[in-house]
Every structure is written in structure tokens, then in C-alpha cells.
């Protein structure tokens, strides 16, 4: 998996440096999360312009598209839900058994979330989960996941600076 992660990161860096499209970066980074880090599903969700709703835009992996369609959440300012906490703090998280509002949408396997940042603020998140009974998310896997999400953020900033045409 480490070799696969590195190969995808190289390809992703080349894409970002060439001003590639954000959607291409999402697919490459998601491939890294799925194949290189060992998650089963990935959802990339972006905040609506009013910043009160989080909407799934990309879903990859086994059941990822179904999960994406269900991934529509209204944010609560000051809420203690894992999603609200991530948006308010911009800190990646490993999710425990308590999934908050995600419980009715996502699976029960080990999961993590990390923010997609743009211009110093959270503009979305990446949710990734493993199948139930899969290995817990150790530090190495968690930091690799976060690194791929950071690459997505860089791709978004680069695409936006290129005139917005390449942004989501």
C-alpha cells in the first residue's frame, strides 16, 4: 500500500502543479484513500453557498454513490455532532461508535473525516469508512488519509486561482 500511496501522490502532485481540474484531483485522491490507505468508501461533500448545508458531491468505492446521495446534512452552529465539530474546528477526526447525525446514513465500520479547506476556511469534508469488522484506523492510516484530503484542498485552491473554471 505504501508504494501505491506514493505513486498516487506523485500523480496527484503533477496534476495540481499543471493546474488540473478539481474533479480529477478528487478522483485521484479518493483512489489513494481507497487503494492506498485501505478504506471501502469515500464521500466528498461540499458546503452549500449559504454554509448551512453539507451536500455529497462525489461518492467512490463499494456503495459510495449510494452513500453520496444520502449525504445531505444541515449544520447546526455550535452543535456537538461530529460533522458540526469538524466544520467548526477544521480538525480531522477518527469517528467512534457515536456517529451523531451520520448514524442513519453511514456504516458502522471504522471511519474518519477531514476538512477540505479553501482560503483559510472549511468548504467541505471527506468522509471515509471501512467495512464493519475491518481493522481500526491506526495513526499511519489516519495521517495518510488526512494527507490525501490536504492534496484535495490544494487542488481546489489551485483550480480556483486558475480562474474558477476548474473548481467544483
Name each region found by the language model.
Residues 1-11, 62-66, 98, 125:
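Regulatory/sensor and coupling segments of signal-transduction and defense proteins
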Residues 1-23, 158, 162-168:
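Signal-transmission linkers at sensory-effector interfaces
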Residues 11, 15, 27-36, 85, ...:
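Amphipathic alpha-helical regulatory segments at dimerization interfaces
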Residues 16-57:
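Helix-loop-beta substructure at the N-terminus of cytosolic sensory domains
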Residues 55, 60-92, 99, 147:
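Acidic/proline- and glycine-rich, intrinsically disordered low-complexity segments
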Residues 109-118:
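A short, aliphatic-rich beta-strand micro-motif
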Residues 118, 136-158:
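Amphipathic alpha-helical "output/dimerization" segments
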Residues 125-136:
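Short beta-strand-to-loop transition segments that serve as allosteric relay/switch motifs
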Amino acid at each position: 500500500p505504501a508504494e501505491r500511496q506514493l505513486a498516487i501522490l506523485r500523480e496527484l502532485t503533477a496534476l495540481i502543479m499543471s493546474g488540473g481540474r478539481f474533479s480529477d484531483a478528487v478522483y485521484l485522491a479518493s483512489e489513494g484513500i481507497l487503494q492506498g490507505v485501505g478504506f471501502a468508501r469515500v464521500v466528498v461533500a461540499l458546503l452549500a453557498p449559504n454554509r448551512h448545508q453539507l451536500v455529497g458531491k462525489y461518492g467512490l468505492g463499494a456503495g459510495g454513490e449510494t452513500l453520496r446521495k444520502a449525504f445531505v446534512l444541515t449544520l447546526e452552529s455550535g452543535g456537538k455532532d461530529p460533522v458540526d465539530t469538524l466544520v467548526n474546528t477544521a480538525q480531522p477526526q477518527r469517528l467512534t461508535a457515536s456517529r451523531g447525525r451520520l448514524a442513519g446514513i453511514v456504516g458502522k465500520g471504522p471511519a474518519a473525516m477531514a476538512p477540505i479547506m479553501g482560503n483559510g476556511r472549511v468548504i467541505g469534508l471527506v468522509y471515509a469508512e471501512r467495512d464493519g469488522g475491518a481493522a481500526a484506523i491506526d495513526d499511519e492510516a489516519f495521517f495518510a488519509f488526512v494527507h490525501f484530503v490536504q492534496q484535495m484542498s490544494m487542488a481546489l485552491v489551485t483550480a480556483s486561482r486558475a480562474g474558477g473554471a476548474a473548481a467544483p
